[in-house]
Amino acid sequence: MKFQSTLLLAAAAGSALAVPHGPGHKKRASVFEWFGSNESGAEFGTNIPGVWGTDYIFPDPSAISTLIDKGMNFFRVQFMMERLLPDSMTGSYDEEYLANLTTVIKAVTDGGAHALVDPHNYGRYNGEIISSTSDFQTFWENLAGQYKDNDLVMFDTNNEYHDMDQDLVLNLNQAAINGIRAAGATSQYIFVEGNSWTGAWTWVDVNDNMKNLTDPEDKIVYEMHQYLDSDGSGTSETCVSETIGKERVTEATQWLKDNKKVGFIGEYAGGSNDVCRSAVSGMLEYMANNTDVWKGASWWAAGPWWGDYIFSMEPPDGTAYTGMLDILEAYL
C-alpha cells in the first residue's frame, strides 16, 4: 500500500479455525484463476535487520490453512530484501530469514495454493533507489533459483515502485524477468509492477511503456494496486462512492485489452461499511466480467500482527475477515 503503515505495526493477533458468518452473496464457481490475500509481517518494523518476533513476524501457517479452507488459492507473501540479504543485493542470504520465508511459502503451496514471492521494497534497497539493473538481475536469478522447482511459486519483481525514472522502472522489471528465467524458473508466472505505486487508476498515464516488457515464456502478469479512498492510498476506511472500484480499474482494463496483456490486482481493500462493501463488490464484479484480461485479485492483508487494523483479513477476528470476507466469498 502507498502509505507504509506496515512498518509501524506491532500489535499481536492470534489465529484459529473460526470463520465469520454474515449476510452472504450468492456463491458461484470462481471466475478468477487466482484469488486470495496478502500475507504480511516479515516486512514490518524499521529496525534493520531487526529481531524476529520483536521487530517483525512471519505469517502463521495455520491462518493460511484457514483461508485456504475458505477457498483462497493465492497468497502474496511479503519480505524485506535487507533482511534476506543484509550485505548487498548480490550477497549471501541470512539463512534463518530465508528458512522462515520458505516455511511460509511451503505452507501455501503444500495447501495447493499459489505463493507470490514479494520483495516489499518500493524499488529501493537500504533506502536508496535500486539503480543497478545488473545487481537486480543477479538478485532475482539467485532468489528464483531457490524456488524454481515449485510450480506453485510465482515472482513479484518489487512492491510499488514510486518516484522513479520511468525507463528505470521498465529496465528493472526486464532485468528481473531475465534473471528469473536465467535461474531455470521457466514454468512460473512473473508479476511486474509499475511506477506511481503501481496504481490501476494511474496506469495508463504513467506506465504505458511497460507494454514493452518481454518474456521468452510469455508468462508476464501486470500487477496493479487499487484502493478506494479519496487519494487511493489505502489509509482510510472510507470509500469515495459505491461505484469507485469499477471506475478506478476501467481504463486499465482497456489498456490490458488494447495491448493483449493480462493483469492482476495485487492489493485492494475497503472499510467494513456499506459504501465500501458495494465499491469492492462492484470492482470485483466488473473484473469478473472481464476475465479475458483479469486473472484475479488479492486483498490487503492478512498477517498475525495486524490487531485491529481496518483491513485485517487475519482469522479469526480480523476486521475484514469478519466484515468483508462474505463479499469476497462470491469469487472464491
From Swiss-Prot:
Enzyme nomenclature, EC number: 3.2.1.4
GO MF, one annotated term: cellulase activity
Glycosylation (residues): 38, 100, 212, 289
Function recorded in the entry: Has endoglucanase activity on substrates containing beta-1,4 glycosidic bonds, like in carboxymethylcellulose (CMC), hydroxyethylcellulose (HEC) and beta-glucan. Involved in the degradation of complex natural cellulosic substrates.
Lineage of origin: Eukaryota, Fungi, Dikarya, Ascomycota, Pezizomycotina
Active-site residue list: 160 (proton donor), 267 (nucleophile)
Stated family: Belongs to the glycosyl hydrolase 5 (cellulase A) family.
Catalysed conversion reaction: Endohydrolysis of (1->4)-beta-D-glucosidic linkages in cellulose, lichenin and cereal beta-D-glucans
Segments passing through the bilayer: none
Keyword GTP-binding annotated: no
Primary location group: secreted
Keyword list, A-Z: Carbohydrate metabolism, Cellulose degradation, Glycoprotein, Glycosidase, Hydrolase, Polysaccharide degradation, Secreted, Signal
Species of the source: Aspergillus kawachii (strain NBRC 4308)
This protein's name: Probable endo-beta-1,4-glucanase B
Stored PANTHER family: ENDO-BETA-1,4-GLUCANASE A, ENDO-BETA-1,4-GLUCANASE B
Top EC group: hydrolase
Subcellular location: Secreted
One annotated GO biological process: cellulose catabolic process
Gene3D superfamilies: Glycosidases
InterPro entries: Glyco_hydro_5 (IPR001547), Glycoside_hydrolase_SF (IPR017853)
Signal peptide: 1-18
GO CC annotations on file: extracellular region
Domain of life: Eukaryota
